[in-house]
A protein has these predicted regions:
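Active-site PLP attachment segment
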Residues: 61, 279-314
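Hydrophobic residues at beta-strand termini and immediately following loops
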Residues: 92, 158, 203, 289, ...
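Conserved core of the PLP fold type I
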Residues: 121-255, 265-267, 272-284, 354, ...
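N-terminal basic, amphipathic alpha-helical segments
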Residues: 1-114, 118-123, 127, 134-136, ...
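Flexible, Gly/Pro-enriched loop and linker segments at secondary-structure and domain junctions
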Residues: 284, 403-404
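Short glycine-rich anion-binding loops that position phosphate/pyrophosphate groups of nucleotides
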Residues: 97, 229-233, 294, 426
Length: 444
């Protein structure tokens, strides 16, 4: 085991056992390297690995700290609340669509029809790659909405975004491969990547999206690049056309794989939705990942991949080892929902409501003195923060407001602090004013 990994393992154990408390400041790499008798880069690599895994956070010149969101192991079993267990969304809670706007009665009718007309064959195990009807409906949807020309055989249904990433890594990754990860970027995907013995390679994001030149200069031999080109999570910027061509050229030249997470692409409030990077994929190096969690509802637990034709056999083999876990009834109901035009009408309605709800919360936050970062789409927003945004988020969380600190989404990159929040379940203007006032009070 490399020395830096041994140091990282010892640090992780100390955090798990409570010897290093959440928020504790670690010695500088210079100081600790002298004490351990190793090079400074060895300590830096150990710190970087734990930052990538979420155990540590960097706060610029202030140093490296144990994450506030890490809790030591307890000697007794405790009941804990997991994300998604609360039936009532918390104010500003991210990752949820507008649950009040979903057409539940329509969905029930479509599903009821499927129940009434199903045959004995519908009670058997479904296709390991997902039901043909749903894959065909997704092909039609992607052709019209995202400019992607593919065949049903290229589509694989999974039970969520994490399952999609796991399927990709099972099919294509080898131990020791590296993956470009947007910095800042979605933190909960990092443990899934490292669990497959793939190294996280943080690449900074600027106003034009992922800095492809930085990625090539620092990690030219990466095997994967995981990106959100349509609406970067969490900054909301789009990958420029020049950089789209640049990353495709790099992937073709390096025989690397681009995983396109088409996050929030359906919700753009100024201009038409951008076409997917996959629509430009002449070299066939892009694996497209989508989900219905934000457009419909998270309990559906249904996502999909579009893989290159030459990789179908590899993915089908892996899918046979861990078959699609989305119930056949739900898949067929969703196929009908798409094919009959209900999904399109629902998206149109949601865009209108989200534009209104975003306007309400922007105005309310501005009235309370907050500065909202402009974004062209998505279902979340960033407000700029001066000072320790992690401490600000902790205060807001204690007041029952589910904001997140932008710094918790960073790995190595530095930048201004901020709070991340969603507006999807702000149901009226009065509620927007109320929660904005609560946030101001919590941070005062």
């Amino acid at each position: 085991m490399p020395r830096y990994q041994d140091i990282a393992r010892q640090l992780k154990t100390a955090i798990e056992q409570g010897e290093l408390k959440p928020g504790a400041r670690l010695p500088s790499s210079r100081t600790w390297s002298q004490e351990l008798g190793v090079s400074r880069s060895t300590v830096e690599n150990a710190y970087a690995e734990l930052v990538a895994q979420g155990w540590l956070i960097r706060r610029g010149q202030a140093g490296t700290f144990v994450s506030e969101r890490i809790y030591p192991q307890q000697s007794t079993v405790q009941v804990v609340a997991f994300a998604g267990e609360s039936q009532q969304p918390l104010p500003f809670q991210m990752g949820l669509p507008a649950l009040d706007l979903f057409p539940r009665e329509l969905w029930a009718r479509v599903m009821g029809r499927r129940l009434r007309t199903q045959t004995r064959f519908d009670l058997a195990l479904g296709d390991v790659c997902g039901e043909a009807a749903l894959r065909e409906a997704i092909v039609d949807y992607l052709r019209v909405s995202r400019g992607i020309d593919c065949q049903p055989e290229q589509v694989f249904i999974t039970h969520g975004y994490a399952a999609s990433i796991a399927l990709i890594l099972h099919a294509l990754a080898k131990p020791g491969n590296g993956m470009w990860i947007e910095d800042p970027g979605f933190p909960l995907i990092r443990p899934i990547v490292t669990r497959h013995d793939v190294e996280i390679l943080p690449v900074p994001v600027d106003d034009n999206g992922l800095d492809i030149t930085s990625g090539i200069q620092n990690y030219p031999d990466a095997r994967f690049a995981l990106i959100t080109p349509a609406h970067q999570s969490p900054l909301g910027v789009a990958l420029s056309l020049a950089r789209r061509h640049q990353i495709l050229e790099w992937a073709d030249r390096s025989q690397a794989w681009i995983i396109e997470d088409d996050y929030d692409s359906e919700f753009r409030y100024h201009g038409k939705p951008l076409l997917a990077l996959k629509s430009l994929d002449a070299p066939q190096r892009v694996i497209y990942a989508g989900t219905f969690s934000k457009a419909l509802f998270p309990a559906l637990r249904c996502a999909w991949l579009v893989v290159p034709v030459k990789q179908i056999a590899q993915f089908r083999h892996q899918a046979s080892l861990a078959p699609c876990a989305v119930p056949v009834l739900w898949q067929n109901t969703l196929a009908d929902f798409l094919r009959e035009g209900h999904f399109w009408r629902h998206l149109k309605k949601m865009r209108q409501h989200y534009a209104q709800r975003r306007q309400w919360i922007e105005q309310a936050l501005t009235q309370q003195g907050f500065q909202v970062v402009p974004q062209k789409g998505g279902i979340q927003m960033v407000i700029r923060m001066i000072g320790d945004d992690i401490a600000h988020a902790r205060k807001a969380n204690a007041a029952g407001l589910a904001v997140q600190a932008l710094s918790d989404w960073r790995i190595r990159s530095s930048g201004e602090g901020g709070l991340l929040l969603s507006f999807t379940n702000i149901v009226n203007e009065g509620m927007a004013r109320q929660v904005a006032q609560q946030l101001r009070k919590a941070l005062s």
